[in-house]
Amino acid sequence: MHYPEPISKLIDSFMKLPGIGPKTAQRLAFHTLDMKEDDVVQFAKALVDVKRELTYCSVCGHITENDPCYICEDKQRDRSVICVVEDDKDVIAMEKMREYKGLYHVLHGSISPMDGIGPEDINIPTLIDRLKDEEVKELILAMNPNLEGESTAMYISRLVKPIGIKVTRLAQGLSVGGDLEYADEVTLSKAIAGRTEM
């Protein structure tokens, strides 16, 4: 189908988002045409602002407006425990349960040889540097319970064991193949309480 160039560009832009295929992108593009101009401008500004005003915490890798982030700055946090997660949505899911009081480290992905993603492509080197500099006693590996998450957890566990830090994994109860961000607070709470040493 031939569209006017601005619509084609908008459809292509929407298709860059995860889970958005050609039909959904087309629907979103045409919906944008029906929106009030002020709403479109506000939407476009929100997209630009999120890129300009947010950064990643230099300590843990979590999204933040200020560096370091509010979690790393919180002196009430237990600095002897770091929970390693795959992405920012996992930090948000863990924080919702309001039980975990330690720090975080966001990897921004998981090891996936099939996708050409190795350990050096995610935030593992900064984790190892951090463990050498801080008084960490326990590392909780909270990767998603899928093949990539398990591979990443095993890799980190092997790297960290020689340093002498206790390495634990969230307890089962999280469904295999599922994502941490979709788990409810009760499931996450039980998983953190029943974590096991690796």
Swiss-Prot record:
Listed InterPro entries: DNA_Rcmb_RecR, Hlx-hairpin-Hlx_DNA-bd_motif, Rcmb_RecR, Rcmb_RecR_Znf, TOPRIM_dom, TOPRIM_RecR
SUPFAM superfamilies from the UniProt entry: Recombination protein RecR
Keywords: DNA damage, DNA recombination, DNA repair, Metal-binding, Zinc, Zinc-finger
One GO process term, biological-process aspect: DNA recombination
One Pfam match: RecR_ZnF
Zinc finger (C4-type): 57-72
Domain of life: Bacteria
Gene Ontology molecular function terms on file: DNA binding; zinc ion binding
Annotated ranges, domain Toprim: 80-175
Endpoints of the signal sequence: none
NCBIfam families: recR
Function: May play a role in DNA repair. It seems to be involved in an RecBC-independent recombinational process of DNA repair. It may act with RecF and RecO.
Family according to the record: Belongs to the RecR family.
PANTHER family in alphabetical order: RECOMBINATION PROTEIN RECR
Record protein name field: Recombination protein RecR
Origin organism lineage: Bacteria, Bacillati, Bacillota, Bacilli, Bacillales
